[in-house]
Amino acid sequence: AKSDLLVDVQKAFYDYIENIAAPTTLRLQYNSWYDFMKDITADNIEKSFYEIEKGLSSNGVAPLDAYVVDDGWVDYKSGFWSFNKKFPNQLYDITQLTANLGTKFGLWLGPRGGYGRPDLFAKKMEKRGLGAYNAEAKDICVADKTYIKNVTDFILKSTQEFNIDYWKFDGFCLSPCKNPNHSHPVGGEYDMYFVSEMWHCWIEVFKKIRELRKKHGKGLWINMTCYVNPSPWWLQYVNSIWLQNSADIGFAD
């Protein structure tokens, strides 16, 4: 800053964040959540994507940046991230549709296990040896090395197979895990050892997804939502940090 005046310090800080942040532009897209929530199916997703595009294009509106499938695709009884029977062909048909519409595809994933019964999901995952249960938060231990490896493999595979341009990572750490038998450190003031390890792991996940997309000459938008500290330093690794402001939705009253 050129002086210690608040306005100069603030400008210098904003310039610094702008310099380190991932390139970000205005983005317009559709997300399935407020239409269907978890009642999505391959059929109603395809119909809604098509109808929205038809309504926009018939009125001279350019294609959206992406169409996003939110929660509702996961088989939570399986013990790991996989597609339920409502999506018999996974997301192949839907991603082909978005390509035909001249736009891109996005997908939701809840690192801590979603918002239904993440405790049951996490326990099944632990039983299968694919992750660990966080007894403090009653969900998936998001710093467990086994889970990080397996979820990274799933994310990268999905990114490649479904040409994912936008990831909505929804729900990270509700409460730090204190289990010393897990493959992460514990202790420190405010559980700082777990928290630091967890975020270092996820930063590497974000980097790997970007590297994969960049390798193929493609872009990527990463949106962190829920149970995330709203720090501007995250913008080095993600494009947006979600803060809830949904008073305009019909069922919020």
Predicted feature descriptions by range:
Residues V61-D253:
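Aromatic- and carboxylate-enriched substrate-binding clefts and catalytic-loop regions
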Residues A1-V61:
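Carbohydrate-recognition beta-sandwich/jelly-roll modules
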